[in-house]
Amino acid sequence: MDAIGVEARPPVYGRVIQWCLRFVGRVGHLWVENPWILGAFTIRLLLAWRSLLFDLSPRQLNRTIWSFISETARTFVPGLFVVLGLSVTLGLGTGAVARAVGPLLQPVFASVVMTVLLRDAAPLVLIVFMASRMGGIIAAKLGSVEGIPASESPVVSDQELIRVALPHLVAGTITGAVFFSLGAYCIVLGYVSLGDPARFLTASPDWFLELKPIQSALWFGVFKSMVFGHLVALVACALGIASRERGLRGARRVADVQNAVWETSVGSILVATLLSVLLWLAVEAPLR
């Protein structure tokens, strides 16, 4: 029996080839199919706006507004304490570094390091958090049976597409702006207090916020965070609904939803990083 089992086992090079083929398939799925899914979903969403603009009764308007509020609250409240804890920790750490460089180098630290931190680093850290938490939840919800009501059609209708996607897009945009504002304020407080916990809540950051480079960095950081939050929700809705439609057309597999959750996080971070580089090349680099 052992000899038969050994003979039936595929050779090592066969397993290596199978692993390489699975890896190539996963990479191709991430870099080829998912961008196509995202582009097609965006076009469908833009075309579906007609059903919202021309068939918006008062009852439907109230239901839509309430869905915006409820989805934003569900997205914002659970992550609030996590973002607050990370922001306070990052703020105190930034203040400790500013105190360590000394008073002579603190103006350079404020004009260079703080500007890059608020304008570039903080939005990217925020999208990693939002993609791993909010994006995964949206993709799992929309890809599951409970996410979208059952239908005989293998394609989600325009009305249903707007109904399930729009609240998540609005919630992602608002949550990105609010979370960044909270994090940026804690970072500024940490710098002004020089990392002293006793002065962290009593320090006044007004003089620091009046500096023009800091104001520009804050506004650009808010803009980036809103775009990134919207992007996370868009990718999650696209991959989640695509997984749902694959299940409507054929046998539903748990792996489809799992892949949608994983690829939402990875895809959102990749697209946001690429967009951040393009924004830096188009807007920030020419100003230097």
Question: Model regions: which residues?
Answer:
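Membrane-interface segments at loop-to-transmembrane junctions
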Residues: 68, 158, 162, 252-266
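Selective transmembrane-helix segments that form parts of the transport pathway or gating/packing helices
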Residues: 76, 80, 84, 130, ...
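Helix-loop-helix junctions within the multi-pass membrane cores of secondary transporters/permeases
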Residues: 145-203
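Membrane-interfacial helix-loop-helix connectors in multipass membrane proteins
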Residues: 96-119, 178-230, 234-261, 284-288
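Hydrophobic alpha-helical transmembrane segments of multi-pass membrane transport/permease proteins
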Residues: 78-100, 268-282
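Short, membrane-interfacial amphipathic segments enriched in basic
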Residues: 7-67, 246-251
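Long, hydrophobic alpha-helical segments
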Residues: 118-139
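Helix-loop-helix hairpins and the membrane-proximal interhelical loops
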Residues: 49-72, 80-81, 92-108, 286
